Amino acid sequence: MSEIPENSKVSIYSKNEKKARELIQKFSMKPMPGITRVTFRKKNNQIFAIDNPDVYKTQGGNYVVFGEPKVDDFTRRLARAQQQAASAAKDPQSIQADMAAAAAAPAAPAAPAAAPEEDEAGQVDESGLDGQDIELVMQQANVSRNKAVKALREHNSDIVNAIMSLSK
């Protein structure tokens, strides 16, 4: 038997899978191209993933999926991502150097930052607005209460548009 070269697109099927594929052709199931990944979740949040599956759709709307399932463990992925983030973190010396550079920068950019404080100094009329809506806009847009009230007034108490306008 000859060896299959690496990175080739050859699929070797078991006897049962060959029979199942032949039956699918007899039942005239339609192949669904363009699907790159299928995941199945069990009750205990265990996830099975099939990369590059062969997916067929029945006339009734059900799907038949062929491929090699792998157990997808999100806790391992999360641990790996946290390790990468920790390794990418700066050491204390570089943080101190950045802080010193920021302190040595000219004080001119601080003047525009004073303008929003003046805007927040006065009280804004909150009548007609729900306190929970104001709190929600404050949390989501990370702004002061006065800015949240003004945004809600500008957008006729529409929370979504108020948050979007403040997030720009």
UniProtKB/Swiss-Prot annotation:
Any one of the GO CC terms: nascent polypeptide-associated complex
Low complexity: compositionally biased ranges: 100-115
GO molecular function: phosphatidic acid binding; phosphatidylinositol-3,5-bisphosphate binding; phosphatidylinositol-3-phosphate binding; phosphatidylinositol-4-phosphate binding; unfolded protein binding
Transmembrane portions of the chain: none
Primary gene name: EGD2
Name this polypeptide is given: Nascent polypeptide-associated complex subunit alpha
Quaternary structure and partners: Part of the nascent polypeptide-associated complex (NAC), consisting of EGD2 and EGD1. NAC associates with ribosomes via EGD1.
Task performed by this protein: Component of the nascent polypeptide-associated complex (NAC), a dynamic component of the ribosomal exit tunnel, protecting the emerging polypeptides from interaction with other cytoplasmic proteins to ensure appropriate nascent protein targeting. The NAC complex also promotes mitochondrial protein import by enhancing productive ribosome interactions with the outer mitochondrial membrane and blocks the inappropriate interaction of ribosomes translating non-secretory nascent polypeptides with translocation sites in the membrane of the endoplasmic reticulum.
Pfam family, one: NAC
Keyword match Repressor: no
Domain NAC-A/B: 14-78
Single Gene Ontology BP annotation: protein transport
Region spans: Disordered: 83-129
Lineage summary: Eukaryota, Fungi, Dikarya, Ascomycota, Saccharomycotina
Family to which this protein belongs: Belongs to the NAC-alpha family.
InterPro entries: EGD2/NACA0like, NAC-like_UBA, NAC_A/B_dom_sf, Nas_poly-pep-assoc_cplx_dom
The UBA domain, residue ranges: 129-168
Keywords assigned: Cytoplasm, Nucleus, Protein transport, Transport
Keyword Nucleus set for record: yes
Compartment(s) of residence: Cytoplasm; Nucleus
